[in-house]
Amino acid sequence: DYTCPQNYAAYTSADHETYSRLYKRQSALLPGLACDEFIAALPSLGLSERIPRFEDINSTLFKATGWEVVAVPGLIPEVPFFTLLANRKFPVTDWIRKPEEFDYIVEPALSNVPVWLLELVLSPGFPDHLQAYGAGGLKAHRLGACEQLSRLYWYTIEFGLMRQRGGIRAYGAGILSSAGELTYGVKSAEPQRTMLVVLR
């Protein structure tokens, strides 16, 4: 299933510093840019500026949602990914971004673990939605429809925006973990923001 242990002892002081810098910067940027549910969930897991231990996070996360984070070595194939989601396990690479990747990275690295964890506790329906998405992904794979499901995932869970009373707000993990994407996606007049119509 591609999961592996989190080798916490392997993290260097530079890794902890990178994580701390990212955590502090993103925490300061979130008010007014992140959705209300995300802001409300911030204190729920007691995350800090230190690299989190998965077992510590999971003890809280599992009680709240029935989910847990599992370490994987990198991007994994569709079937193992969807299987993990269907079993309420979210795969996260256990490595820290390099300084040159500080503002954006393609893979769900440990650097945006807080984002994913908070996504899972945003609302009572989200944990079940993500599990159903995993089950749906397995069905889509059998039907040869993974491309469509991947697109939906990309524009919602990864880069989703929503309209709230205060205006456009971010809820996608890829946006919330990147300073540039967060400000651009929510505040800039340049992006073309299209209302999601699932059947389109």
PLM features: residue spans?
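The feature captures two recurrent sequence modes
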Residues: D1-V121
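Extended, Lys/Arg-enriched charged tracts that mediate electrostatic binding to polyanionic substrates
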Residues: A140-A173, S177-G180
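C-terminal structured domains
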Residues: A173-R200
